[in-house]
Every structure is written in C-alpha cells, then in structure tokens.
C-alpha cells in the first residue's frame, strides 16, 4: 500500500503465563488448593469457571453433570463438580434468568444425589482472585470448558498453566471454543 509492504497474521490471544504462574507461588493459592482438597475429601474434583453468560453453555453443562450422575450413581461419591460463575450484567433480565436457572439446576442435582455427608455440585456465584483460581485449578483433576460458542477462552489456558507437570489434570474442552485450535492435548467434546 503506497509503496509499503503490509503483512496480516493471526495472533491468538494468550495469558500472561509468568504473571499467572506467579500467583501459584502465593500463600493464597496454596491455601486455596489445600482447603479444596480437604473439603472435597480427596474426591476427584472437576471445575468450570465462566462468567455468567448465555454463550458459556452453563445450563447445558449442568444438564450433562446431571445425566452423568443419573447414569453412574456409583460415581456420586467419587466426583464433585465445582462451577464458579461470577455475575455479569446483573441489570439485564436474561442474565438474572440464567442465574436463577443455574441455581435451580444445581439444587435439583444436589437434591437428587446428595447424602448427609456429601454434595455433588457446588455452584458459586462470586468472583475470585487470580491466586484463588490458580489454587482451585491446581486442586481439580478435571477442567471443564464447554461454551456453546466462544472466542479464545483464556480459562482453558489458565487451567493448563496451573497444572502440576508431574501429575497434571485433564482439560475437557468444547471444540467450539477458540482455544481448541491451540490446546491439542485437551479432550475435545461437542
């Protein structure tokens, strides 16, 4: 253009790896991981962290968790699912409806599968610091990132970055997340 060369390339967004992994060296991250391991009583923990948004497929995710426990009732004692969904756009009716629906679905799953000493689903409608999320990711052996359609989902990359290389967890990732193009080691689902 006008005697100049122009090159256009795609550069997928990433996380600040050094900054994020530095969070893992904090006392807050270590304490969060220890609290989670203690509170889950060494059950396999699966985590989803998504802002409260219709594109994230959160109702469908809870439907999948419900079907899993219905088909595998013996696994209720082995698995705990933790969904962290910080509120977003709280003044919009459709987002209020999603929150109410998630609370209802989590309650139905827990009502059907809880016992006096365990609750299979923990739904948390609050934000957490990067250090707390690092600790939570480290404590969870399964990361679940299953948006209906998404751009470059950074949570998937944060989950992978928080894993212990000697004993990493598994990332279950929607093929409709932009991160699926880069995270070839993830278990891709539709």
PLM feature segments, named:
Residues 2-5, 23-46, 73-76:
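Nucleotide-sugar donor-binding and catalytic loop/hinge architecture
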Residues 56-58, 64, 153:
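Active-site helix-initiating loop/hinge in glycosyltransferases
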Residues 128-141:
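Short acidic alpha-helix that forms the nucleotide-activated donor recognition element
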Residues 85-131:
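Nucleotide-activated donor-binding/catalytic signature segment of Leloir-type glycosyltransferases, i.e.
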Residues 40-55, 62, 81-82:
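Conserved donor-binding/catalytic core segment of Leloir-type glycosyltransferases
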Residues 70-82, 138-190:
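Catalytic binding pocket for nucleotide-activated donors in carbohydrate/polymer assembly enzymes
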Residues 50-52, 86, 126, 190:
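Conserved donor-binding loops in enzymes that form glycosidic bonds
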Residues 14:
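Carbohydrate-associated surface elements
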